[in-house]
UniProtKB/Swiss-Prot annotation:
This is NADH-ubiquinone oxidoreductase chain 6. It catalyses: a ubiquinone + NADH + 5 H(+)(in) = a ubiquinol + NAD(+) + 4 H(+)(out). InterPro entries: NADH_UbQ/plastoQ_OxRdtase_su6 (IPR001457), Nuo/plastoQ_OxRdtase_6_NuoJ (IPR042106). The keyword Mitochondrion applies. It is found in: Mitochondrion membrane. Keywords: Electron transport, Membrane, Mitochondrion, NAD, Respiratory chain, Translocase, Transmembrane, Transmembrane helix, Transport, Ubiquinone. The chain crosses the membrane at residues 5-25, 29-49, 56-76, 91-111, 151-171. Its EC number is 7.1.1.2. Its main location: mitochondrion. One of its GO terms (molecular function) is NADH dehydrogenase (ubiquinone) activity. The keyword Transmembrane helix applies. It is a multi-pass membrane protein. It is an enzyme of class 7 (translocase).
Amino acid sequence: MNIDIFLFYLFSIFALISSLMVIGLTNAVHSVLFLILVFCNVAGLLLLLGPEFFSFMLIIVYVGAIAVLFLFVVMMLNIKLKSTNISFSSLWPIGILTFVILLSQFFSSFYELDLVKFQGKELFFISWANENSNLTNIKVIGKVLYTHFNLLFLICGLILLVAMIGVIVLTMHQRVDVKKQQIALQLARTAPNVIKFIILRRKR
């Protein structure tokens, strides 16, 4: 067996198992950890297919930022498990219906790919980025992004800018009844105006 095919099946199996563990575990921290493992396996699949830029971006963005953020949020919230009275027998029809829909989608996609014709042939993956005049996928993505989709790219930048400003405005609460420290007035004060002697009279 080719090493690429072996790694493809290995990453696929681990990604499926990790996905099942994400939705099957009751501990939220463990679910987030398995979600990070899913992202790593998908990044390995993308690395096998050719676009290494997307693979590293998946690890940097999802694993390095979003998944770690989820993990810290879940750990700081200290989510407590609550016992529910839902019986699993009532969930069987929904589970069977979902399984049948997913299985039909799998077989329909398997039939459309027509993998029967590829029997006896060695399966390999075509790197379309390298086929395009021997350009790397980063150059291809940059060329397409800054030429054909330059307007959409600018719109995405404006949306992110508006979102950033909106978050700052929503989190900036100014209270009027709070006494603020004025450094300039404090430094301009002199000793005769500040120090005041009080004469205390003793009671007889």
